[in-house]
């Protein structure tokens, strides 16, 4: 059972608007690459990809906006959820023991695993990019295998 707000928030019309918003934000995130000319072919990964050495300031902004801020927001939200889960048994009367439903816990755990996988997969590439942006000479000292592995 979910709240009455759910039907209003996720109506067919609103869902279409959310999808359009996601695509608009995606295009908005890509457009600056054309002006900075940061999309270049990289023979190490055999692909056209974001060149971290084109503009240090731009690379730092990309890492902050597309990785650090989302990780920070999601971490904050998960901490709030865990704090709430820990505090709920203390707020409820001792004789009535609320139990977390198995499907609620499974859903929470699934979303947490998705978050951890996002962080684990994107952290190496973003931290290498941030290191190269802050110290450009460091780019030559990063082993090619490490750079290539960060893409996979």
Swiss-Prot record:
Major subcellular location class: membrane
InterPro entries per record: GPCR_Rhodpsn, GPCR_Rhodpsn_7TM, Melatonin_rcpt
Molecular-function GO terms, alphabetical: melatonin receptor activity
Keywords: Biological rhythms, Cell membrane, G-protein coupled receptor, Membrane, Receptor, Transducer, Transmembrane, Transmembrane helix
Annotated Gene Ontology cellular component terms: plasma membrane
Residues in the Extracellular compartment per record: 35-58, 133-144
One Pfam family per UniProt: 7tm_1
Entry's localization field: Cell membrane
Transmembrane parts of this sequence: 14-34, 59-79, 112-132, 145-152
Superkingdom per UniProt: Eukaryota
Presence of the UniProt keyword Repeat in the record: no
GO biological process, one term: rhythmic process
Induction (UniProt): By cocaine, which increases the levels of day-time expression.
Role noted for this protein: High affinity receptor for melatonin. The activity of this receptor is mediated by pertussis toxin sensitive G proteins that inhibits adenylate cyclase activity.
Family: Belongs to the G-protein coupled receptor 1 family.
Protein name from the UniProt record: Melatonin receptor type 1A-like
Species of origin: Danio rerio
């Amino acid at each position: 059972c979910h709240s009455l707000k759910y039907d209003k928030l996720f109506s067919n019309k609103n869902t279409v608007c959310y999808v359009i918003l996601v695509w608009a934000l995606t295009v908005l995130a890509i457009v600056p690459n054309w002006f900075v000319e940061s999309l270049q072919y990289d023979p190490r990964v055999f692909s056209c990809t974001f060149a971290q050495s084109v503009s240090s300031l731009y690379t730092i902004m990309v890492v902050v906006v597309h990785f650090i801020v989302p990780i920070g927001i999601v971490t904050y939200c998960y901490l709030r959820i865990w704090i709430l889960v820990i505090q709920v048994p203390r707020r409820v009367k001792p004789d009535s023991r609320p139990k977390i439903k198995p499907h609620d816990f499974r859903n929470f755990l699934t979303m947490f695993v998705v978050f951890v996988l996002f962080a684990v997969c994107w952290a190496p590439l973003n931290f290498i990019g941030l290191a190269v942006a802050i110290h450009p000479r460091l780019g030559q000292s990063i082993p090619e295998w490490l750079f290539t592995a960060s893409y996979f």
